[in-house]
């Protein structure tokens, strides 16, 4: 089916009507002595269906690219920050930079990221968002860090390396997300070594959500391990989740890493996380994502004082 004559290919390339494409393919198939007459029409239809699928996929990617390009050019997004609290001191230890898109269609950030990846623009979008967050670094209290979500391919790019050359790299945490499987961990680790030597810390997101995150932890030796929200949910009444959290804290202590619990929404969850030995946490109970405050709150959230 891959041996199309020039006539059929010409119709496909020019983008003529479906009937014209089908006729061209049919004539091509009829001209093949190896194709019986009774099969010419079915073969032509199958080829047309395949070609239409390719054209639809190409058009979809083009629309995705245009949407992402428009969002970047129009800056149709805003950076919000969610505080990460030290549960012992009750103070803000850091801020995670998150994104809210204002461009239509209204969709969650993970959909925009997936679309950017499909359109081949993940690097461009992630770097624009990272720069927008870094531009506000000086508004953070000097003793807090800024956590940026980057895919592995973006984090190791030359453009990201240049972007992260800030005055105090020890205040930057690169939170690795995974949109595609990592092909070579040794290469990734080596590529990240330059950032880490300058003081940038590495965090692994979604720990406990699946095998991929655990593989990240084992192969990349992170400074921070972020407990996935699926483990935080119901941890107050699930002995299995509690045991996993305790084990993760024990592992982190032995390798010199820190565990951060995500998605804390109730006081019972907070109590269970504390009981497991987790020192850092974030979630709607403690602070919702929003514009960066100009100064650290004078008082910690009431929930941390109990």
Regions found by a protein language model. Name each.
Residues 45-78, 115-122, 294-306:
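C-di-GMP signaling machinery
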Residues 57-115, 282, 287-291:
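Active-site core of bacterial EAL-family cyclic-dinucleotide phosphodiesterase domains
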Residues 24, 112, 133, 248:
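Aromatic/hydrophobic pocket-lining residues that form π-stacking "cages" and hydrophobic walls in ligand
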Residues 3-4, 28, 72, 116, ...:
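A generic structural signal for well-ordered alpha-helical segments
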Residues 121-188, 263:
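Catalytic core of bacterial c-di-GMP phosphodiesterases, primarily the EAL and HD-GYP domains
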Residues 1-5, 15-55:
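Short, flexible helix-to-coil linker/hinge segments that flank and couple to helix-turn-helix
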Residues 88, 101-104, 152, 175-184, ...:
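EAL-family c-di-GMP phosphodiesterase catalytic domain
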